[in-house]
Each structure stands twice: as structure tokens, then as C-alpha cells.
Curated annotation (Swiss-Prot):
Gene3D superfamilies: Carbon-nitrogen hydrolase (3.60.110.10). This is Aliphatic amidase. SUPFAM superfamilies: Carbon-nitrogen hydrolase (SSF56317). The gene is amiE. Transmembrane segments: none annotated.
């Protein structure tokens, strides 16, 4: 893991995260013009950072937040579509990979709300991963939720997963990506104040807990409703920050992520190898007791057993110590039911 140079190497993936200024857009043509601006940014960053392999833009960087419901539907994208074609051409032209936001992506059933989607485009202009946000930021966001994570071979073979903003507040999604083999988890977010310190902290903790690289791209600026705090960052698999932006609009950070180092750590580290130890629980004591050398593999967590085997029961259980309705009468949001 290296930070401070503009290069990359056969073993290192050059990654840039962009503090993109949150746009406020209303029409399809405005969205497409913004896509063309993002394409220009890619060309400029590649010129300044010749080692660049992967560039990452924040959630909402393409469409902005459509606070008007009809505008949200009118500007929703198809994948592939006009927006993705612009991004694909920019990646191909500049020989880089890119992560781009689509808020939203049209639902297969036209009357249902769109998805909040990320795409990973390779240096040939091909879409190699499409991820739909599993955990939209309720009660404000009204995206239709996605239902799974993905892992693909990224630049130089580094295994990449995509997650979005509020997803990252749930340890389960990080662990799911990591346990499926992800070595770099990309978190694109449009996160606003007041949650700045919590969001800076959680990505470092999740990198450490899951022995994975983390790249965060966050929005900056004020869109008339929210103020976005930036702090796009790149975190090493040991939880240390390699590079972090401030609140500056359109700032960026860059680091080189070693493919070999993370694989070496996952293979040879012992006391802090959380991924291995979770599925080989207590192996030292089990071995010393003469019960084999693999530890205990069974899941000891009652909540997860219930969730998998009886989701409705798990839902009822959490409502017993939280609340039975999605809305809250003391602070209503829209027309969400409060009883």
C-alpha cells in the first residue's frame, strides 16, 4: 500500500476517489451534460495521475437528488443507456476503470420506484458489475431496494465489490462482500452533515474488521437542502487511512493498492485474521482438547439463524424493542404510516 506518488505498478492498483460537487438537476439533458462533465474529469485526472487504474465518483454525482418525484421518474436511466455510454467511452478512451452512480435506474415494472444503482466499467468500456442499493436511507430515500452483493475481478485482478452510502452502516454487508472474496469494497455516498465523524470512523473499522481495502467517494457542496461533507478516502486493509480529502469541492485522493499484500495478509496473518477465525472459532482450544484442528464452523448467533430461517419472526422480534410501524408520529415523514 502506497500513498504520495502518481504511479502504479504491475502489483498495485492506482485508485482515485473524487469529492464531486453535488449537482442540482431537473431534466434529462442536464443529466447528460453532467455526464459529459464527468467524462472530462476522467481525462484530466488520468493526465495528472498516469498510474490511475480506477476512478470512483460519489452517489448522486450523475443525477443529483431529484427532490421532485416526477423528475425522478423522467430522468431515470436504463442500463445500458445514454448515461452509461458516455461513461463507457471515457473509460475506454483513457484506459481506466470507473465507478459511476445512477439515481435512479428504471425499475423493470414501470410504475415502481427506480433503483439506486452503481456500475463498474472496465477499461474496455464494458459494464462488469451493476449493484443496486440494498439498504436505502429510509425514511428519506424512496428507492426500491436491491437484493444482493457482487464480487468481480477488477483492475489487475483485484476483486471488487460495490456498496452505496447507508449500506455501509450495516456490518452485514461488509462481511458479505468480504466473505465472498472482495479485496476492495467501494462505498459511494452522498452523505451529509451531521453524520460526518461517524462515517469517517466506520469505514476504517470495517476495513480492519474485514481485512479489505475500502475506497469512499463522497459528495461535497450544498444543493439547497443538504450540506455534504466530502472526506472521500482510501483505507488500507489494516484500517489505516492512506489518503483523505477535506471538504473541498472536486478534490481527490489517490493511492496504490497492492494486490499481493492483501492476499499475503489474508493467508499468513493469525491473531487479527477475522475472516479465517470467524469460521474456525476457538481453533487453538479445540485442537488442544483433541477435537480436531479446524475449530468450530457452526454459526453461534441466534439472530442470524432466525433471520435466515424465519425472516418474519426476526422482523417481529426487532419490533418488540424498537417500534411496530415504519413511521414515527412524533416526527412524520411524508405519508408513512405511524400506527
Amino acid at each position: 500500500m502506497r500513498h504520495g506518488d502518481i504511479s502504479s505498478s504491475p502489483d498495485t492498483v492506482g485508485v482515485a476517489v473524487v469529492n464531486y460537487k453535488m449537482p442540482r438537476l431537473h431534466t434529462k439533458e442536464q443529466v447528460l451534460e453532467n455526464c459529459r462533465n464527468i467524462a472530462k474529469v476522467i481525462g484530466g485526472v488520468k493526465q495528472g495521475l498516469p498510474g490511475l487504474d480506477l476512478i470512483i465518483f460519489p452517489e448522486y454525482s450523475t443525477h443529483g437528488i431529484m427532490y421532485d418525484r416526477q423528475e425522478m421518474f423522467d430522468t431515470a436511466a436504463s442500463v445500458p443507456g445514454e448515461e452509461t455510454a458516455i461513461f463507457a467511452e471515457a473509460c475506454k478512451k483513457n484506459k481506466v476503470w470507473g465507478v459511476f452512480s445512477l439515481t435512479g435506474e428504471k425499475h423493470e415494472q414501470a410504475k415502481k420506484n427506480p433503483y439506486n444503482t452503481l456500475i463498474l466499467v472496465n477499461d474496455k468500456g464494458e459494464i462488469v458489475q451493476k449493484y443496486r442499493k440494498i439498504l436505502p436511507w429510509c425514511p428519506i430515500e424512496c428507492w426500491y431496494p436491491g437484493d444482493k452483493t457482487y464480487v468481480v475481478d477488477g483492475p489487475k485482478g483485484l476483486k471488487v465489490s460495490l456498496i452505496i452510502c447507508d449500506d455501509g452502516n450495516y456490518p452485514e454487508i461488509w462481511r458479505d462482500c468480504a466473505m465472498r472474496g472482495a479485496e476492495l469494497i467501494v462505498r459511494c455516498q452522498g452523505y451529509m452533515y451531521p453524520a460526518k465523524e461517524q462515517q469517517i470512523a466506520i469505514v476504517k473499522a470495517m476495513a480492519w474488521a474485514n481485512q479489505c481495502y475500502v475506497a469512499v467517494a463522497n459528495a461535497t457542496g450544498f444543493d439547497g437542502v443538504y450540506s455534504y461533507f466530502g472526506h472521500s478516502s482510501i483505507i488500507g486493509f489494516d484500517g489505516h487511512t492512506l489518503g483523505e480529502c477535506g471538504e473541498e469541492e472536486n478534490g481527490l485522493q489517490y493511492a496504490q493498492l497492492s494486490v499481493q499484500q492483501i492476499r499475503d495478509a489474508r493467508k499468513y496473518d493469525q491473531s487479527q485474521n477475522q475472516l479465517f477465525k470467524l469460521l474456525h472459532r476457538g481453533y487453538s482450544g479445540v485442537f488442544a482438547s483433541g477435537d480436531g484442528d479446524k475449530g468450530v464452523a457452526e454459526c453461534p448467533f441466534e439472530f442470524y439463524k432466525t433471520w435466515v430461517n424465519d425472516p418474519k419472526k426476526a422482523q417481529e422480534n426487532v419490533e418488540k424493542f424498537t417500534r411496530p410501524s415504519v413511521g414515527v408520529a412524533a416526527c412524520p415523514v411524508g405519508d408513512l404510516p405511524t400506527k
